[in-house]
Amino acid sequence: HRMSVYSQKILTETAADTGVQYEQNSKGLLYLYRNPEVLAAGSEHVSLLQEAGQELEIVGKERALEIIPELADSQDQLAGGVFSPTDESGDSRIFTEQLMEVCRSMGGTFESGVSIEQLDASGTEIKRVVTNRGVFSADRYVLSLGAWSPLLAQKSLGVRLSVYPVKGYSITIPVEKGHTPPRTGGLHEEDLLGFSPMGDHFRVSSVSEFCGYDLGHTPEDFEHILKTAKRLFPNAGNYDKVEFWSGLRPMTPEGTPILGTGRHSNLFYNTGHGHLGWTMSCGTARITADLIAGKTPEISTELMGVR
């Protein structure tokens, strides 16, 4: 939670400094509940977060419908929810692409189509990165390969990272004339479904599956997401033109990322963000930059190091 709050601050600063636009929606997020008893149980966790400084509001059905009036068609299945007015949503791909252009304008370079074959080390330092497009050498290196981080670390360095691939699925629904997607994003806590308005598209994600590095998917894999999305928001978009996607979340047992150096003093880890990759991205990037520059990060990374 501490990392997520810090990262949101850095993301906001980054967006303001660079001017990147990414279908950002600053109307907060609503966490929905169908069962009153489950909502009551969830309220206990809300108290802990409120004590930690998080702005949260426990809401009944009427208030939930004020926040997301598009839930009217499924209000008979709505007990209430928890509203976080400071949370935001947006399109992470657009954010990343625009930030890449900002970096290029500052002299940064990006190499596409490059596969890392080996990290060469001597003693406690990384000396070079061997790829299919040649050898790259630098003073400092950052290992940030998502779910593939542990494969390279183990193969090249014999370092075992507690990062495991967990497959998630999402659908993107085009919003056409006459459609009424929710204007505020959120999550359905019991159906384990996240939803986010993105301009002329509406994205819904769900499911966690342990299947190694398999990226394939079948129509059956999306049945739960489609069924629940249609039940909650029947007029959100054109469900006949849905785009399907699956990807791997780099999960750690504790749910916290792995940051800092290990046995190699010039290799900085920034991986294991799980399902909160974009949420924690700017914060962990700032921390990594601070560590590379020899600065003390603004927040502690205790218990987030390589073990």
Residue ranges and their predicted role:
Residues 18, 37-52, 71-140:
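Helical element adjacent to the flavin cofactor pocket in flavoenzyme catalytic cores
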Residues 13-24, 54, 105-109, 159, ...:
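Surface-exposed helix-capping loop/turn segments at secondary-structure junctions
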Residues 60, 112-114, 243-245:
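Short loop/edge segments at beta-strand edges and connector loops
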Residues 58, 121-123, 256-307:
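C-terminal lid/capping helical subdomain adjacent to the catalytic/cofactor pocket in oxidative enzymes
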Residues 1-8, 31-41, 62, 66, ...:
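Short beta-strand to alpha-helix junction loop
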Residues 1-61:
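Dinucleotide-binding Rossmann-like beta1-alpha1 core, especially the glycine-rich loop
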Residues 72, 118-121, 125-126, 135-265:
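Active-site substrate-recognition segment that forms the wall
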Residues 107-109, 202, 267:
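Short, conserved active-site loop motifs that form the nucleotide-linked donor/cofactor pocket
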